[in-house]
From Swiss-Prot:
The lineage of its organism: Eukaryota, Metazoa, Ecdysozoa, Nematoda, Chromadorea. Gene3D superfamilies: Acyl-CoA dehydrogenase/oxidase, N-terminal domain, Butyryl-CoA Dehydrogenase, subunit A, domain 2, Butyryl-CoA Dehydrogenase, subunit A, domain 3. Keywords: FAD, Flavoprotein, Oxidoreductase. GO terms for biological process: fatty acid beta-oxidation using acyl-CoA dehydrogenase; L-leucine catabolic process. Its EC number is 1.3.8.4. This is Probable acyl-CoA dehydrogenase 6.
Amino acid sequence: MAFLARKTSSLLPATTSSTVKHMIYDEPHFAMQNSLAKLIKEKINPNVAQWEKSGRYPAHFVFKMLGQLGVFAVNKPVDYGGTGRDFAMSIAIAEQIGAVDCGSIPMSVMVQSDMSTPALAQFGSDSLRNRFLRPSINGDLVSSIAVSEPHAGSDVSAIRTHARRYGSDLIINGSKMWITNGDQADWACVLVNTSNAKNLHKNKSLVCIPLDSIGVHRSTPLDKLGMRSSDTVQLFFEDVRVPSSYIIGEEGRGFAYQMNQFNDERLVTVAVGLLPLQKCINETIEYARERLIFGKTLLDQQYVQFRLAELEAELEATRSLLYRTVLARCQGEDVSMLTAMAKLKIGRLARKVTDQCLQIWGGAGYLNDNGISRAFRDFRIFSIGAGCDEVMMQIIHKTQSKRQQKRI
């Protein structure tokens, strides 16, 4: 079974410059992808197997390398170390970070670049951005986004973690669940209730909380189905005291800030999934070409050809939908429905690709040292995280319904 020992090749950027203009990328995007591909191939992928086995990767070491490359600087203010580049650069980076040989590190990186820092970059005070944003852009600090709770996942308005005023400080109590980077993070962007107002969409604030604060406790890393080397914990806040100036932007606007960045988070998730799913298909074709069964290779079987062809077509359609959505977003259009469609599609396609490719590999695909097995475990989260499939369908139908009402 020599195929099990085959060295996985790092995928190059999904697209390269040519005489045909790319839909959303230009030369700087390709240059960033090439630089990132080189770093992943030389510094990250050689260590992935060991990090996955140990259940932890060195976030500060990896983030510092990525920070020096400018991965965390996109869409961030130049005054705080950002590059101010467009959202298409975020997608170019997210797409290329998918070349990492596991889902754990891309997810962890995207938390810092596209989840914990956007609201801070846009609405935070100068002092907050100097304290938390600048070193996060440089890769000196690792951050988490802390929104979900044990009883509040899709229903963000139902969170119970609260903060009460004590002079010029906030006293925070509650807990947060499924916190990516939580065991290694230096600080977290935390959504808390800051008033008892009945309007659950206007009583919440985003607060920067240093995770070495007195009263912050972390669970042992959670034992997950996939994303093994990404540390995920439950955070507990027991009378945690921070300055009220650590509130990002306006008090009571936290829910709105969080909702506004969900679209970008979801598009980044779609981008991250493209290369790994392409890799699953490509590696399965290689294996099927070598594997003999009943005197023929698996790839000679028409049903295998049809299955792989369909997966390729669906992946290309998803890629095209992503690019169309990003282009519309960069032009200022409302892309809530398109984003929900793309996010729904990548989640379902991830399950389909990894399941059907694993089926072609058979027993060999069931072994943990096979990349197909890891992909099967890692990318199941795409239908759950950043908005589950059911929420995406609600968003799509809401837009459908409004559209039809206008026609009546």
